[in-house]
């Protein structure tokens, strides 16, 4: 109901963003409350998404056994539980972090639940693009919980994780093609075909690789992060290019691209948490508490 895999992935990225900004000076209470608060917000969004998607979930093999589809738990109960999680999560962020971190969490939540889940996912091929923003919010929340401002580092993180979401999501859409087609969800492989989807995967990975390199180039991380970025990005890009081989098994290839995406973003989150650099940066935006 609350998608623990998604929560775990966001936990890793928010921790990476937090430790990147903390630069070795960690406020343990702030870190734990940021992680807990954001995890509850993400869980809330996932629960509301399940309520909204119950009609299309019933048409998909992967999701037809969700409790909101089977009726094991009433939609009303899931709705109340999800809203309660969100209220507690936002409350923790409001009490322990700052206005910038809270603002990003609120915007990400509204984009995911209000714009993506309610409309874009069902009606537009650009739904994945809109959803990528909300998926990129957790590391920025972690980062801004420490800094209290939007600086170049925060912008790079937002771009980096937004770009990562695209090939990651397209890979899922390819190996779950039958499910998305059955539910008439206009993801890129269904709406525009596999050739277009493969091209977009390669292009997004290439741009993601360049943007990831901006963290060390801008002085936020060191040579170790750059090495991890180059190694994982080239590996991921190489796997994506295999999609153009003759007689390729698209489902197997897409699962490999998906697996590479998980390894890549996990490695980068760990690397930026450990290979931080001290940077004097002029904030782009600051909200006074």
UniProtKB/Swiss-Prot annotation:
NCBIfam families: cyoE_ctaB, PRK04375.1-1. Gene3D superfamilies: UbiA prenyltransferase (1.10.357.140). It holds the Pfam family UbiA. It is found in: Cell inner membrane. Pathway: Porphyrin-containing compound metabolism; heme O biosynthesis; heme O from protoheme: step 1/1. It is an enzyme of class 2 (transferase). GO terms for molecular function: protoheme IX farnesyltransferase activity. Keywords: Cell inner membrane, Cell membrane, Heme biosynthesis, Membrane, Transferase, Transmembrane, Transmembrane helix. The chain crosses the membrane at residues 1-21, 28-48, 76-96, 100-120, 125-145, 155-175, 199-219, 221-241, 260-280. GO terms for cellular component: plasma membrane. It catalyses: heme b + (2E,6E)-farnesyl diphosphate + H2O = Fe(II)-heme o + diphosphate. One of its GO terms (biological process) is heme O biosynthetic process. The keyword Ion transport does not apply. It is a multi-pass membrane protein. It comes from Shewanella woodyi (strain ATCC 51908 / MS32). This is Protoheme IX farnesyltransferase 2. Belongs to the UbiA prenyltransferase family. Protoheme IX farnesyltransferase subfamily. Carbon 2 of the heme B porphyrin ring is defined according to the Fischer nomenclature. Its main location: membrane.
């Amino acid at each position: 109901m609350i998608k623990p895999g998604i929560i775990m992935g966001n936990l890793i990225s928010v921790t990476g963003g937090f430790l990147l900004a903390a630069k070795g000076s960690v406020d343990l209470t702030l870190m734990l409350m940021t992680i807990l608060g954001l995890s509850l917000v993400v869980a809330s969004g996932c629960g509301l998404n399940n309520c909204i998607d119950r009609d299309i979930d019933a048409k998909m093999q992967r999701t037809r056994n969700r409790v909101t589809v089977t009726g094991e738990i009433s939609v009303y109960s899931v709705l109340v539980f999800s809203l309660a999680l969100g209220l507690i999560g936002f409350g923790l962020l409001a009490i322990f972090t700052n206005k910038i971190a809270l603002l990003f969490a609120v915007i990400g939540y509204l984009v995911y639940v209000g714009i993506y889940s309610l409309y874009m996912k069902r009606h537009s091929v650009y739904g994945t693009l809109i959803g990528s923003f909300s998926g990129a919010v957790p590391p920025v929340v972690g980062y801004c919980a420490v800094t209290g401002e939007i600086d170049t580092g925060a912008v790079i993180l937002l771009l980096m994780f937004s770009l990562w979401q695209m090939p990651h999501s397209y890979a899922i859409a390819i190996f779950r093609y039958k499910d998305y087609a059955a539910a008439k969800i206009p993801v890129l492989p269904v709406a525009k075909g596999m050739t277009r989807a493969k091209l977009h995967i390669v292009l997004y990975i290439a741009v993601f690789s360049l943007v990831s390199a901006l963290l060390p180039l801008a002085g936020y991380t060191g040579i170790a992060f750059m090495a991890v970025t180059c190694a994982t990005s080239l590996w991921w890009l190489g796997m994506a290019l295999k999609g153009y081989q003759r007689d390729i098994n698209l489902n197997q290839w897409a699962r490999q691209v998906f697996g590479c995406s998980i390894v890549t973003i996990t490695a980068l989150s760990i690397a930026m948490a450990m290979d931080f650099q001290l940077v004097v940066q002029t904030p782009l935006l600051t909200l006074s508490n």
